């Protein structure tokens, strides 16, 4: 195999939950992508506050990777474009939704995988982590 990383550790340093135990070794139980998409229980409190607004998956490690950035390009496939209804969604977006509303809006999307209950959990944690980050930033400015 080819080692594209060399001595780079940008993904390890950028991961908000320290999911990378060491180079090339990811502890999925700390990974925001795993926790928000696959994990079925309550998210551990020590990780929940570190979501930085991520409610479904996380791309931080990919976004900082110099190798990946060489090939990064926004998709031209319409189905892969950001959905406006989520970009404009407020804090209670999923809380107000019924199961029928959720299915009508997201049955044909990856958000169907965690389902409404876990999206509610994730959405609450994402908003809470953003509020926490704002509080920390305000405190640091003082």
Residues of each region from the PLM?
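Acidic/histidine-rich catalytic neighborhood
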Residues: 33-57
């Amino acid at each position: 195999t080819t080692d594209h990383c060399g001595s780079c550790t940008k993904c390890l340093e950028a991961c908000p939950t320290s999911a990378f135990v060491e180079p090339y070794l990811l502890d999925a139980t700390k990974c925001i992508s795993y926790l928000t998409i696959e994990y079925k229980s309550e998210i551990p409190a020590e990780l929940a506050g570190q979501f930085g607004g991520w409610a479904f998956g996380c791309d931080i490690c990919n976004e900082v990777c110099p190798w990946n950035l060489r090939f990064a390009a926004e998709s031209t496939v319409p189905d892969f474009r950001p959905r406006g209804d989520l970009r404009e969604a407020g804090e209670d977006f999923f809380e107000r939704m019924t199961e029928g509303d959720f299915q009508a809006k997201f049955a044909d999307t990856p958000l169907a995988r965690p389902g409404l209950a876990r999206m509610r959990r994730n959405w609450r944690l994402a908003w809470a982590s953003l509020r926490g980050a704002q509080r920390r930033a305000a405190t640091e400015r003082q």
